[in-house]
Amino acid sequence: MKKEIIISGFGGQGVLSMGKILAYSGLMEDKEVTWMPAYGPEQRGGTANVTVIVSDERISSPILSKYDIAVVLNQPSLEKFEPKIKPGGILIYDGFGIINKPTRKDITVYEINAMDKAAEMKNSKVFNMIILGGLLKVAPVVSDKGVEKALKKTLPERHHSLIPLNMEALKEGAKIIEEVK
């Protein structure tokens, strides 16, 4: 198993954190992983993306031109990365902020209304964990247990009390992701 994933959106949406949690989850499950962030000079509001590769075998290069899975959280990311998904790949997008929907017919497209779910949960900071839950439902590259271990590793100890909320958000994401026909 080898999955090459790009996650992209605006800075402040938790894109890099989501990628880091995914990568650490793979490490916790003894998988080979790479995590390669890219972002503009802005801390919030600029574009950010992260490439994560999770594999059972050695990874030759973290630099990719095509992806198995793209998670896009804004219109510029959709326009940039939809053409870079391999035929037969997966595109996941949050319905909030996407005006022109994906058009490719040779990939499987999923919509997840994570922004709405985060508002319902009364915590906008779990947005990225809702997205990650949806991703792991359609492409289970790591387990929930791996994610929980990764949260313990990546979150400062003073924030460990937030792990149950993050795990709840992960489960909610798995419930609300839907394939677009």
What are these regions (language model features)?
Residues 1-181:
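Active-site cofactor/cluster-binding pocket
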